[in-house]
């Protein structure tokens, strides 16, 4: 797994895990806002642009990040955050290692498996994957995702770099993920965020995550769609981290 880093090496460690189909720039504004006070590490998840290996499973990505933390930071860090697929990987990390961080931020993580969605992914991408290489099609996707306009070049470049096999693999993994029973042993203070304008499955998932974690809080973000908090409102996200830590 490859990593992009910001900030001071001797400072408290914050690791942020990007959403599926995105990359480290998901958290670029957040990292720049926090870099004077923290050491920010942005892993590039397997199967994504600039990654060093294909995507296999959410569980394997979690294990890789745990190994990285064990190797470089004596088994624990200050805070880990994750969006969507990254949020699922974070939940898996917390399930595998209950005391790996002091704080955690789960944003828009799906934990209600859908076999119907799973079955549709391979046929859908088998027929339209080639269109991803065209800017007009990517702009339609980009607009639907509600990502701020200045990230389009990053989005187009990195989406084009994802293989069809990897894209199908991580989307299918995303559609089938459910919480492990061991999540209840997590000792971190967990903050769960979901946009008010997200779909019902995402809203229900946020409730399930909150109810499964004794030391957690849930905030529904008024007016926001999927992933908008960390992607489009990076300074607000960074300020929320400061508020959590100081509060």
Residue positions per predicted region:
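Acidic catalytic loop of the alpha/beta-hydrolase fold
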Residues: 196-201, 227
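Gly/Ala-rich beta-loop-alpha elbow adjacent to hydrolase catalytic centers
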Residues: 82-86, 90
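Flexible "cap/lid" loop of the alpha/beta hydrolase fold
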Residues: 95, 101-131
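Conserved alpha/beta-hydrolase catalytic His-Asp/Glu region
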Residues: 115-117, 131-184
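Short beta-strand/loop motif that positions the catalytic acidic residue
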Residues: 186, 192-194
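Active-site loop/oxyanion-hole signature of alpha/beta-hydrolase fold enzymes
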Residues: 41-81
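Conserved HGGG/HGGXW glycine-rich cap/lid loop of the alpha/beta-hydrolase fold
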Residues: 6-50
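Catalytic histidine-centered segment of alpha/beta-hydrolase-like enzymes
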Residues: 224-235
């Amino acid at each position: 797994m490859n990593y992009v880093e910001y900030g001071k090496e001797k400072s408290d460690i914050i690791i942020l895990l990007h959403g599926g189909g995105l990359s480290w720039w998901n958290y670029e504004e957040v990292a720049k806002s926090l870099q004077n006070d923290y050491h920010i590490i942005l892993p590039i998840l397997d199967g994504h642009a600039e990654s060093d290996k294909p995507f296999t499973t959410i569980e394997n990505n979690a294990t890789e990040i745990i190994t990285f933390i064990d190797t470089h930071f004596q088994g624990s860090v200050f805070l880990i955050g994750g969006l969507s697929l990254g949020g699922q990987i974070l939940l898996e990390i917390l399930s595998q290692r209950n005391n790996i961080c002091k704080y955690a931020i789960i944003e828009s993580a799906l934990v209600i498996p859908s076999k119907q969605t799973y079955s549709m992914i391979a046929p859908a991408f088998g027929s339209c994957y080639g269109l991803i290489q065209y800017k007009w099609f990517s702009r339609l996707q980009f607009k639907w995702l509600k990502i701020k306009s200045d990230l389009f070049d990053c989005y187009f470049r990195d989406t084009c770099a994802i293989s069809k096999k990897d894209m199908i693999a991580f989307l299918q993994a995303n559609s089938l993920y459910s919480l492990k029973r061991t999540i209840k042993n997590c000792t971190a203070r967990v903050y769960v965020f979901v946009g008010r304008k997200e779909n019902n499955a995402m809203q229900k998932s946020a409730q399930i995550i909150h109810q499964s974690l004794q030391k957690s809080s849930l905030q529904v973000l008024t007016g926001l769609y999927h992933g908008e908090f960390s992607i489009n409102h990076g300074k607000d996200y960074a300020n929320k981290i400061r508020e959590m830590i100081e509060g």
